[in-house]
Each structure stands twice: as structure tokens, then as C-alpha cells.
Amino acid sequence: METIFDYNQIKEIIPHRQPFLLIDRVVEYEVGTRCVAIKQVSGNEPFFQGHFPEYAVMPGVLITEALAQTGAVAILNSEENKGKLAFFAGIDKCRFKKQVTPGDTLKLEVEITKMRGPIGKGNAKATVDGEVACSCELTFAIQAK
């Protein structure tokens, strides 16, 4: 998969930073409508120190956050939203179907389905080796800094 935005370019689009920037690169992108990102899950992730030391599993809330960050790239790189912030406003129909563990390549796909003023919705899916790890509907709010 060809990289469209690398880690440093992602940091120019969304405000997240280590240790909370949860996407490594963007491999597909359609301005304002769709984004696919990759997270290479390393055994050195800070969250694995406590979740769980004997059986490392990426917390589901961080998978949904990675999906939200992927959606934020799609929205915040559009001309009308550059320099703004995207806030998580809700999550519906969230399902976790596969554990994400060190060494996994997490593919994060978000399609923006609705925008009404500063509020938007998107369908999101995280997969590992083609198997769905998480799926959900995200709601977000765009706000000026």
C-alpha cells in the first residue's frame, strides 16, 4: 500500500501527538469523505504495560480513538476545516470482534456519511488481516481553535 500521508504529514493535519497519536500513515484518502490509515501495533506501546502485562491486548477504546483520528484526517484536511479541531461526540453500534495484539497491522477505514453544519457522522471499521476487529458509527463535532 502506497503512503499518501506519512506520520509527520498526519501531525500537520490533526493535533494529536505521542503517546496519543494512534495512526502511522494514510494509504487511501478522499478529501472530506473517506480515509484509510494504518497502525502498526508494537509490543512497545505504552498501553500494553497495563493492558495486560501477561496478555497484551490493545484496549477497545483506543481502537475507536484510532478510527476517530482516521476520520479526523478526512475532515480536517479539507479547505474549510484546516486548522480546526474535531471532537468525538458519540459512538453507536460499536462491536469488538477480534483482539488486537502486538505485531498486528491495524487497518482503519472511515467513510463520512453525513455532515450537517459542524456535526458529522461516519461509518468506521478496523481490521487485522482482513478480519473485522471493530466496527462502529462515529459522531463528531468540528470546532475552531
From Swiss-Prot:
Keywords tagged on the record: Cytoplasm, Lipid A biosynthesis, Lipid biosynthesis, Lipid metabolism, Lyase
Record's protein name: 3-hydroxyacyl-[acyl-carrier-protein] dehydratase FabZ
Class of the enzyme per the UniProt entry, highest EC level: lyase
Alphabetical list of CDD domains matching this protein: FabZ
Function as written in the Swiss-Prot or TrEMBL entry: Involved in unsaturated fatty acids biosynthesis. Catalyzes the dehydration of short chain beta-hydroxyacyl-ACPs and long chain saturated and unsaturated beta-hydroxyacyl-ACPs.
Organism encoding this protein: Staphylococcus saprophyticus subsp. saprophyticus (strain ATCC 15305 / DSM 20229 / NCIMB 8711 / NCTC 7292 / S-41)
A Gene Ontology term for the protein's cellular component: membrane
Source taxon at top rank: Bacteria
